[in-house]
């Protein structure tokens, strides 16, 4: 699937933040969302390329798409499976 930020119902700007802040903010934001909603995360911390996919697996959310070829990194996360 190609990366389509228009799928997002919410956006989280995490640029300039360093581990573990981006993932903590993703967790806090997703808690306020309904199942099926999609979060667009923008970050520039290289650790997010590892941490966000792991977070999604561990917390049973779906990483719909990731763009990690250039900054800012962008992730589309669907709440729930």
Curated annotation (Swiss-Prot):
InterPro entries: Sulphur_carrier_TusA, TusA-like, TusA-like_sf. One of its GO terms (molecular function) is sulfur carrier activity. The keyword Acyltransferase does not apply. CDD domains: SirA. Keywords: Cytoplasm. It is found in: Cytoplasm. GO terms for cellular component: cytoplasm. The keyword Hydrolase does not apply. It comes from the Bacteria. GO terms for biological process: tRNA wobble position uridine thiolation. It holds the Pfam family TusA. Transmembrane segments: none annotated. Its main location: cytoplasm. The active site is at 19 (cysteine persulfide intermediate). Sulfur carrier protein which probably makes part of a sulfur-relay system. Belongs to the sulfur carrier protein TusA family. This is Sulfur carrier protein TusA. The lineage of its organism: Bacteria, Pseudomonadati, Pseudomonadota, Gammaproteobacteria, Vibrionales.
């Amino acid at each position: 699937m190609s990366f389509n930020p228009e799928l997002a119902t919410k956006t989280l700007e995490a640029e300039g933040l360093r581990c573990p802040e981006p993932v903590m903010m993703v967790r806090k934001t997703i808690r306020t969302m309904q199942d099926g909603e999609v979060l667009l995360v923008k970050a520039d911390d290289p650790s997010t390329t590892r941490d966000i996919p792991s977070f999604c697996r561990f917390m049973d959310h779906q990483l719909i798409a990731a763009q990690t070829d250039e900054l800012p990194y962008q992730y589309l996360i669907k709440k729930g499976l």
